[in-house]
């Protein structure tokens, strides 16, 4: 995109409209955005928000381990539930199995918290590729319907800071306030219904953000929908000067990789920041197989060695 596509640091309405169409999500007002770096910064903020909740805490994560970090969160969630806050926890059991610490289910039960696994697996049922593939990779915390934290942080000692006895894995989260949080809550409600067959009250829908106001949108993929990929492909096609991508796993769909490659070939400065050490060797190997073609197109790839 060129400087003419923005006004005072804000994207033009036509750009917002196209992003909204591709994301299949309205652009809603954003009152505040804060970057939270790593668990050492994010986890205390998350726990303080849970302690401050008056009405509801909705918590969704790919990994909610039963280790020291998970138990600390379970305790804070339990305290909220005991003071009358509606607490709902949705976690992925397959993701949780990938880290040390075991299941968080018993700790949540002992704290009186309603914790539900998404698409649980059982040795009595066949482990089909569909059941293993369709997992809940989202990470969100929604407080009273008006404040949310989203990003890449899972609940495990791996993400906790060294001062908490954790491994301080590098990751990022965003704290968001404003009308856009309603769509984060809607995305949670949809996953909760898929996991439990229960419907949670729909959040109040608010009008779209006014023109030239700070706004955001929630691109919430479902099986068969590829809104996020559509947004990436379009952004890559529109980039004129630079395109910077950071991700834990470069296992994006082929059309997205092709869009990045095409941008580099037409002279856009395309730069990737990827992990040098990866907890999923197969994902790392798959990503590195794409390095040669991307670099041949002119992209630069940097690996984080922290």
Residue ranges and their predicted role:
Residues 1-306:
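Charged, low-complexity intrinsically disordered terminal segments
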